């Protein structure tokens, strides 16, 4: 779960290579080791070449984010599914266990000991995270993956204007163009979805049910846009004061959300034997359990792959990859979940894809202009914070 991500919100980052880098990512071996004989040296050299290969990093990042979205959609797509808080609690528990295991065997070396004072200060951010991930799963439950992916772009607009209001940010004319395209793609997607619902059923009652489902999905999506922007802006404000390093924010986010999610599940969700049987039918029970466990590990994978991508490329390339990755995520919904393929839905995906490219281009130009000017402030977010944030979204 971590900061859930899979959603590629672009945050300003330095392009000069001074960002924090994940210490567990493999580095190129020294020249003396490369000249040695024996299979061990050859294997190490091959692994080092892969670890420093930009296409491999980009592919790993794309596959991890796509798989996270697909798995989340699969788990919450059951007709009787109503245990979202429980699902998110399992994600957080699996993620914490994975982090502690990686620390124990030495893969993660820079995780600070738990601090009660920091936990109290970070707890409000974790509450915002609960709101973001819960509304995200509810929206994904009622909407198709392409529509969900397209509407997530609206969060970028909310964050941009939140930065203008609270952090003195600015929005360039090119960014405004991308925002217009994002809104247009959302309108086209909603129109295509509604048309498909109206004409897709053989009986008026089916169309009415489909419209009600879409309305619920749009309502949850609107709340998710608000919660996502509040969480990311709140995290930006607090993270500098906390002096969190690579894995600290992921660790605290998951650890602090576990009790909240468990309490919410016990209070708000039905734990009767009959309801558990409806949520976990025998024919798909094992697959659901595997998906829930993978979703927790997926947060680690996305964080690792995004940090890897940042390390071997540039933040501009990383932002562009995030924009381009919207297309395969949307297509995955068409492939795996039989989302309606209509002229409207395809047009919405294409417009959303173009809006992401335009936005990434706008951020690249803004970053280039900032580098040519004298620095007046510190970068707002490190590579590790960016990677943890991406693990939020799927």
From Swiss-Prot:
Topological category with respect to the lipid bilayer: Multi-pass membrane protein
Signal peptide: none
Organism: Pyricularia oryzae (strain 70-15 / ATCC MYA-4617 / FGSC 8958) (Rice blast fungus)
Keyword set includes Transcription: no
Identification of the protein by name: GDP-mannose transporter
Disordered as annotated region, ranges: 371-394
Cell location: Golgi apparatus membrane; Cytoplasmic vesicle membrane; Endoplasmic reticulum membrane
Tree of life domain: Eukaryota
Family: Belongs to the TPT transporter family. SLC35D subfamily.
Positions on the Cytoplasmic side per record topology: 1-55, 102-121, 168-173, 235-246, 309-316, 363-394
Subunit details: Homooligomer.
């Amino acid at each position: 779960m971590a900061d859930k991500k899979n959603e590629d919100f672009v945050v300003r980052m330095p392009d000069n290579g001074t960002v924090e880098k994940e210490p567990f990512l493999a580095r190129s071996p020294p020249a003396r080791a490369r000249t040695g004989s024996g299979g061990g040296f050859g294997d190490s050299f091959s692994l080092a070449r892969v670890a420093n290969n930009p296409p491999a990093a980009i592919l790993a990042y794309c596959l991890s984010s796509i798989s996270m979205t697909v798995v989340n959609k699969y788990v919450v797509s059951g007709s009787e599914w109503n245990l979202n808080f429980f699902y998110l609690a399992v994600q957080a528990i699996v993620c914490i266990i994975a982090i502690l295991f990686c620390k124990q065997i030495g893969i993660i070396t820079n995780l600070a000991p738990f601090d009660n004072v920091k936990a109290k200060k970070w707890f409000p951010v974790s509450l915002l995270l609960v709101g973001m991930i819960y509304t995200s799963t509810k929206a994904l439950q009622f909407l198709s993956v392409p529509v969900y992916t397209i509407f997530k772009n609206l969060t970028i607009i909310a964050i941009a204007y939140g930065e203008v209001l609270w952090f003195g940010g600015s929005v360039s004319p090119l960014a405004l163009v991308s925002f217009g395209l994002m809104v247009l793609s959302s309108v086209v997607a909603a129109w295509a979805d509604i048309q498909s619902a109206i004409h897709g059923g053989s009986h008026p009652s089916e169309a009415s049910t489909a419209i009600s489902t879409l309305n619920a999905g749009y309502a949850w999506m609107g709340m998710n846009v608000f919660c996502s922007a509040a969480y990311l802006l709140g995290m930006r404000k607090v993270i500098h004061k906390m002096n969190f390093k690579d894995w600290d924010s992921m660790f605290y986010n998951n650890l602090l959300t576990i009790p909240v999610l468990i309490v919410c599940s016990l209070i708000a969700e039905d734990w009767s034997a009959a309801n558990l049987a409806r949520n976990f039918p025998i024919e798909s029970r094992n697959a659901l359990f595997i998906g829930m466990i993978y979703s927790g590990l997926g947060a680690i994978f996305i964080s690792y792959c995004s940090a890897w991508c940042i390390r071997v490329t540039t933040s501009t390339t990383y932002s562009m990859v995030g924009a381009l990755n919207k297309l395969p995520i949307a297509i995955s919904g068409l492939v795996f979940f039989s989302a309606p393929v209509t002229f409207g839905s395809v047009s919405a995906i294409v417009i959303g894809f173009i809006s992401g490219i335009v936005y990434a281009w706008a951020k690249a130009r803004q970053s280039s202009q900032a580098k040519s000017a004298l620095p007046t402030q510190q970068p707002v977010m490190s590579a590790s914070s960016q990677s943890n944030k991406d693990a939020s979204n799927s």
